[in-house]
């Protein structure tokens, strides 16, 4: 499965043409796209209105949506934070740690447009698209 980060969804909604957005639009099989619940949260909280949020939600529900955080992921995400900190990689958002750990645990590929994930992938076996 391909986990698509909010950075890509938001850029796509804004009509962006970044490399990640182009890759998202090129995915031929939408059943391979996974939307994490916390990614859905990040995207919806940026909507301009309730009506805009409803349109975005309808569109995103076309893909598989999964919960990304449970007790095990929380513990391993904290361990990843310490591991990365020891190597000088600063993680600015806890949500990114959850997404990272979810992808590592489930062996999913991450499609992102966020430099923080590049720093994490330099130290952990995160598969990125």
Task: Please give the residue ranges for each predicted region.
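A generic structural signal for short hydrophobic patches within well-formed alpha-helices
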Residues: 9-10, 40-43, 117
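Conserved beta-strand scaffold positions in the cores of enzyme catalytic domains, especially
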Residues: 65-66, 128
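A general structural signal for well-ordered alpha-helical segments in protein cores
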Residues: 21, 40, 53, 74-78, ...
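Short, well-structured N-terminal submotif of metal-dependent ribonuclease cores
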Residues: 1-35, 45-58
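Structured helix-beta-strand junction loops
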Residues: 29-31, 62-63, 87, 106, ...
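Histidine- and aromatic-rich ligand-binding microenvironments
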Residues: 5, 36, 92-93, 114
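Active-site neighborhoods of divalent-metal-dependent phosphate/nucleic-acid chemistry enzymes
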Residues: 66-111
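Acidic, PIN/NYN-like endoribonuclease modules and their adjacent C-terminal/linker elements
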Residues: 1, 104-129
